[in-house]
């Protein structure tokens, strides 16, 4: 319960101290995916959660990664707290009814969806480091081997500007059970390390990794690449950098963008377009935006607003790109989180925290 309550307070402080943007938004809600009244809550005890980061499992299904998860609607009644959790579906988001979850990782049939891998949960991370919780960033799978990798952030604390211990990787041979690896990207003492929140996209022999600071601070977005079959070897990562004359790989990273970034999401679409979505958490215009490019190194387009704040004392954030999205009209599929903004907000069907499918156009 402390996890969820603290996160709610923090998100409210960061993003709802400023007015919502009034710019025209492209994306509209299609279906609420999480709740006690949805299959997520009825079948697997995922009644309140956030994120819902989708990644292609290359077996006809998409895995959806969730953060702090409880089996009750409200923080005050929080039960069965765990993170991360994964639900699965092979239903195309373009279907008339939207996405419906069909199974959960770590459980056969119905039953409480368990944590995907170890979480210190107000204790030891397993290596002697204090850990408040673990939050997933992204997932990737490799059909050549059947292996899966999840990038995550180990959180030290949730203060006004939440502080991670490090970014890390969890590994699976089947996409059902995962183990944390020793590979880590440590945060710095100033909490400004730009490699703490990840999004990953494969293209050919390379996996491209886009990273930002935690806590929606102003800062750079960095780009690295790594051979797909060497992701667990930190020495194989190559930075994309500017040397004063030109850009190139195998250099210290230089910022490809700057801003108040929420969790980034990057996907290469079927037509070859690269799409990026994130929460622009600037103090004047908090909204979910998209950019496009022909390749991972850019240049990236100007921002297009996809989702504005609803203006009903709730908080919308996330905007994770479904891997089956396309560049066609109304075929950008986003997973958007919704938190109520105050403890005395009127009850709604969505409860305190939920994830919904939005549909938009790049």
UniProtKB/Swiss-Prot annotation:
Signal peptide per UniProt: 1-22
Keywords assigned: Glycoprotein, Signal
Disulfide bonds: none
Pfam families in alphabetical order: DUF4185
Glycosylation site list: 157, 190, 280, 338
Practical uses of the protein: Notoamides have been shown to exhibit antitumoral activities. Notoamides A-C show moderate cytotoxicity against HeLa and L1210 cells with IC(50) values in the range of 22-52 mg/ml, but the IC(50) value of notoamide D is greater than 100 mg/ml. Moreover, notoamide C induces G2/M-cell cycle arrest at a concentration of 6.3 mg/ml.
Domain of life of the organism encoding this protein: Eukaryota
Function comment: Part of the gene cluster that mediates the biosynthesis of notoamide, a fungal indole alkaloid that belongs to a family of natural products containing a characteristic bicyclo[2.2.2]diazaoctane core. The first step of notoamide biosynthesis involves coupling of L-proline and L-tryptophan by the bimodular NRPS notE', to produce cyclo-L-tryptophan-L-proline called brevianamide F.
Protein name: Notoamide biosynthesis cluster protein J'
Organism: Aspergillus versicolor
Lineage of source species: Eukaryota, Fungi, Dikarya, Ascomycota, Pezizomycotina
Gene label: notJ'
